[in-house]
Every structure is written in C-alpha cells, then in structure tokens.
A protein has these predicted regions:
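The feature captures the conserved acid-bearing segment of alpha/beta-hydrolase catalytic domains
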Residues: 15, 110-124
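Conserved loop-alpha-helix segment in the C-terminal half of the alpha/beta-hydrolase fold
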Residues: 133-154
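Alpha/beta-hydrolase-fold enzymes
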Residues: 2-87
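Conserved beta-strand scaffold positions in the cores of enzyme catalytic domains, especially
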Residues: 16, 155-157
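Hydrophobic, aromatic-rich cap/lid helix
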Residues: 90-112
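Catalytic active-site module of serine/aspartate enzymes centered on a nucleophile-bearing elbow/loop
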Residues: 159-184
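Short beta-strand/loop motif that positions the catalytic acidic residue
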Residues: 123, 129-131
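Acidic beta-to-alpha connecting loop that harbors the catalytic carboxylate
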Residues: 132-135, 160-162
Length: 184
C-alpha cells in the first residue's frame, strides 16, 4: 500500500506497480480478513499503549512479527508459505524482520489510526496491481483497486500464484506485462 500512498501524494509519479500489495493499516487495525471488531481494536490500543509506558520505563523495547520457527503443525497455509520463503535460503536475510524477530511491537500502533490508502481514489497516473489468485492477501489488492478511478488502472490476478510466489518465482512473475506497462 505504500506505493499507492506515494502515488496519491506525489503527482510527479508517472506510473505505479504493486505486487502482492498489503494494506498495512487495514491488517493492523482490522486483523487478517477483517476479523477484529471495534472492541478488539480498543483492547489492542489499551494493550499497546500500556506496553509503550512499560517499555519507556524499562528502556527495553520488544519485537514481534517475525515468521514463527519452528512452524507449528496447525499453522495456516499462508504462514507455511511465509516460512518456506523467509526461513529458508530462498528468502532468508539476517536483517529481514520477517526472517528474524520482527519489528518493534509498537510499530503496529501507528497504522491502527492512520489509514495509508485514504486518497488512492485521487491517483491520476497509471496503476498496475498484481496479485496471486491463491494469495491470502488478494483481497487487499481487489478492494484497493475498486477505489481507483480512471481507465489507466489495471488489476492483474495471476492464476495459481500465492503471495510469496510473486516475490521470486520467475515462472509466474509477469515481467513482460510489467515492462509493457511502464513503456506505455
């Protein structure tokens, strides 16, 4: 979503491509698949702000959100797919938050009340959004695409692809389509 937010903010951007886009504000404020209620969000704010005070007092700052390892037997498919990418040679990096212990626990607090995609309907430049048909996150792109205006916007769903396939699977990443989009 950050690329769309940048395009909404800066008219100098001529074209934007997103691939397996995440709406970080939405997932932090509403949970995966919009599973959180207003009461859940309130409880989240209470917990995180209490933690903020505790961390300030102790001077120690916690991290959270790295891909779980070892992988529990009941992990959802998308967590297994993340594990296959971030916890293996395929995508591991010693500085990657997902490969390791995540980001600062309080990082999500800023996203809860600051929806980054508020003005994407005002993007006048071209946008190509790419997502895998089998991606758990597909709804982020589909819903954001519905808010875009103009005939220079396209949503491309890649059959059979999951979220992480569009990170590094050279057989499914539509390089030709991306190149032709930027050449227009």
């Amino acid at each position: 979503g950050f690329a769309l937010n940048a395009a909404a903010n800066d008219p100098r951007i001529k074209a934007t491509v997103t691939s397996t886009m995440y709406d970080m504000s939405r997932v932090n404020a509403n949970g995966y698949f919009d599973s959180m209620s207003a009461d859940d969000r309130y409880d989240l704010r209470v917990r995180l702000n209490e933690r903020r005070t505790e961390e300030y007092r102790s001077g120690e700052y916690g991290r959270d959100g790295g891909v779980v390892d070892p992988l529990p037997d009941d992990a959802p498919l998308f967590v297994r797919q993340y594990h296959d990418y971030y916890k293996t040679q395929r995508g591991y990096h010693r500085r990657s938050p997902n490969s390791n212990d995540g980001l600062n626990v309080l990082n999500s607090l800023a996203f809860v009340n600051m929806p980054i995609l508020s003005y994407i309907g005002e993007i006048r430049s071209a946008v190509l959004m790419i997502h895998g048909a089998e991606a758990h996150s597909r709804y982020f792109s589909e819903d954001a695409f519905k808010r875009l205006t103009g005939d220079n916007k396209e949503l491309l769903i890649i059959p059979g692809a999951c979220h992480v396939d569009l990170y590094d699977n050279l057989d499914v990443i539509p390089f030709d389509r991306i190149e032709s989009f930027f050449r227009k």
